[in-house]
């Protein structure tokens, strides 16, 4: 028979936050949508970021989960806010996104796979818009859309490089207008981004209508509202717009909702989930995708500005293995104090990035069994020399108990003065915004624009996008736009290859390097190790 986890009924988890049963729409005994409007925010927001990760990630999600459990052990009413996992990484390189060991969110298998169907709804809404666009072409193209200038892509929640660039509409006149097209990962779509930033249904519909999908032969932009797509898209998204409530392995509340990637979108959970968490809990721990150059930068420059959510403290997650990696060690699973010492340059840059926005980070060292005492001492000394709070985190092995010291440092940090400041004024030019991010956050010497990017920049200015904040899509495994540059690269120039106005989401996406919005699978994907036993239990997804 299928093994049932020893979990609390979701009604009991909700009761910890004062949520009554009639505010829940249940998806079985352990998952629920939260109904109604969020109460006025009263809680304090703790943002969790990290140093540049190795391909496997450094345990930012695990640390955030364990921190919430530790805060409850200290008598604090805390809630977790995370993004939903994408099937791309689940079956690709990283695996699931529900934490690991004793610091997990549950029911993890359901969350990692179909969950409450939110990603299906987003995917369907994107593909409906595509279908309406292609149908418009087929039915006479009254708007005069240029098939060569269609920006919209279809969506799929799977890493499948073969679908990046395709030709559709083949087979004769009855099968549509032939044109080039492609797919992107659902979490890279503009619909996912605007779902994460919309405040209510009215705002959601306004944002959907503002999505630019193509240009006419005369160069005039065409929006989703021009295709009369908004109402049907909103209907598909109605249930998905409601935040999901689940629990940690210790039975504490976790809001998990929406999932824009940190390297190709803005990289944090939905505004609705954060507002519910902040309205119901005293402390909210929220994760920002990847490292400070991606998720944190975008949170401070885009999310905080758009939503008004401003952190009270920042946790910076580091690991010994990542420091070895950035110190030049390929076999980063073995002790190497020399490599760790060299790799501290990467940690130093991420500390500086947090400080750019007005905060002193709490350094959380996510512990692994291979960590040597000498290596740990190097990181502790680094923090002490700079007057930064430091705590080892052993939540993977010990759950909330292993995060008590970190929780204490975070509570102390909440009382420290901070002054949130964005990196650039919104009235600055798009070039100046990109230059500020590249030089001050990445450490680049300058920015180079391709001819295609220059043309896109000119069009963006003409369309009135210059007052929007910038979201950079770039490699996540380096501070630069070159994924092979480890540590703290210096003397490099980043190259802008393209630019897109995302008026629905409310930002401009700037593409750097060879970033793809639809990843491919590795030679040995995580999918090879996943199975279902004779009794229906999932195997190979316990991280």
Swiss-Prot record:
Pathway: One-carbon metabolism; tetrahydrofolate interconversion
Keyword ATP-binding: yes
Alphabetic keyword roster: ATP-binding, Ligase, Nucleotide-binding, One-carbon metabolism
Catalytic activity: (6S)-5,6,7,8-tetrahydrofolate + formate + ATP = (6R)-10-formyltetrahydrofolate + ADP + phosphate
Main enzyme class: ligase
CDD domains cross-referenced by the UniProt entry: FTHFS
Residues that hold ATP according to the record: 54-61
Gene3D superfamilies attached to this UniProt entry: Domain 2, N(10)-formyltetrahydrofolate synthetase, Formyltetrahydrofolate synthetase, domain 3, P-loop containing nucleotide triphosphate hydrolases
Alphabetized GO MF terms: ATP binding; formate-tetrahydrofolate ligase activity
PROSITE patterns: FTHFS_1, FTHFS_2
Any GO BP: tetrahydrofolate interconversion
Record InterPro entries: Formate_THF_ligase, Formate_THF_ligase_CS, P-loop_NTPase
EC number(s) recorded for this UniProt protein: 6.3.4.3
Family the entry assigns: Belongs to the formate--tetrahydrofolate ligase family.
Protein name (record): Formate--tetrahydrofolate ligase
Source organism of the structure: Thermus thermophilus (strain ATCC BAA-163 / DSM 7039 / HB27)
